[in-house]
Amino acid sequence: MATADEQEEEMRMRLPLPLGGRVAIVTGASRGIGREIALNMAEKGAKVVIHYSSNQHAAEEVASIINNKSPSSGDGVRAIVCKADVAEPSQVAQLFDTAEHAFGPLHIVVNNAGVTDSKYPTLAQTSDEEWDRIFQVNCKGAFLCSREAAKRVVRGGGGRIINISSSLVAMPIPRYGAYTASKAAVEMMTRILAQELRGTQITANCVAPGPVATDMFFAGKSEAAVEAGVKSNPFERLGKVEDVAPLVAFLASDEGEWVNAQVVRVNGGQV
């Protein structure tokens, strides 16, 4: 005879998953925030395309975790990987083609892929090449993926475009000029896109994390710089990827439909 806990778990498993039947692309999903977003969405029922640009092994590891720990839906493979340069239109189109071929119509696109300059130069010290590199991935990449999503994501309900920005846009900090400018552009682009998608029931929002304990955050920072980030937060800690992913999944769900054209800053009250 099943225990009370076992009965409760069985009942929970029978409940419809909030992202059940949905298909999602998550860019930059091989590590960091993107990895956790992909894992969280899969746990909530979505089939997920794990996009990566260089680290195939890490991307395949994420897909393996999802496929080895699938909800009891019996629908086979629920995650695949796909390499693409998000700043190249043809490769972005191929990414979407791959997703549709594997899983059918798309519902959710999370544009998370991003880069920064771990040397943290001032604007006066920022090279043309570095400025262009950051804008190519962070801004053009988000634009190309959002443009493709606007054409391909399902209409009539359940369509979601979620761009990952940064709380730095709301707190201009020296030596993040190119990165912050690229994310500011993404925020305004997203708000305009939401208005242009009027009548489709596709929502477009930004999630803007504060400092999160990822490889990208730690790269090039001294212990003192990290500690300063910790102390500046009311919680006196860095954010965790687990602080961000559930919010993204909420925006992707039916419950998040009335949130549209918004920038949601998730930073523990830092700004």
UniProtKB/Swiss-Prot annotation:
Disulfide bonds: none annotated. The keyword Phosphoprotein does not apply. It is an enzyme of class 1 (oxidoreductase). One of its GO terms (molecular function) is oxidoreductase activity, acting on CH-OH group of donors. The keyword rRNA-binding does not apply. Pfam families: adh_short_C2. Its EC number is 1.-.-.-. Belongs to the short-chain dehydrogenases/reductases (SDR) family. This is Short-chain type dehydrogenase/reductase. It comes from Picea abies.
